[in-house]
Amino acid sequence: MFFGLVKGDSKPRQQAQAISSVLVVEDEPLVAFDNEHVLEQAGYRVAATVEDYDHAITVIEQDEVDLVIADITLHGDKTGIDVARHAYGKGLAVLFVSGACPIDAHEMAVGCLAKPYLPRDLLASIGVIEAVLRGGELPRVPRGLHLFDRVG
């Protein structure tokens, strides 16, 4: 099930970013809606907001996505870990958002943001991931973000 699908540009970003398009994979409708709203207001393009593995994979295969923000628990038999493995195999950055980060998360994600989190912490986490992807100096790491030393 798609919670919302946004195609095209939202607000223009002030400067070129490593991350412009985000896929939100979240099974809790209120959290999904909040994430989508916060991301759009910050100028990111939300490729889609989905609640299960199958829809996430469809978006990854058919749309340009720079970052996958994935909860661990999803509707259906597969989890956010399965989504992350697929996304990582396609060369995409993954940020887990979960109360309990998977023990092997460093093998498929850039970081894990602990739930519950504030909107500013989600946006700051994306800023940190952008710095990691560009190889630049890291900004302040927000509360609740565990950044992995390496991926894979």
Specify the residue positions occupied by each region the protein language model found:
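Conserved acidic carboxylate
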Residues: 26
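Non-catalytic signal-transmission and effector/linker regions of two-component phosphorelay proteins
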Residues: 1-21, 118-152
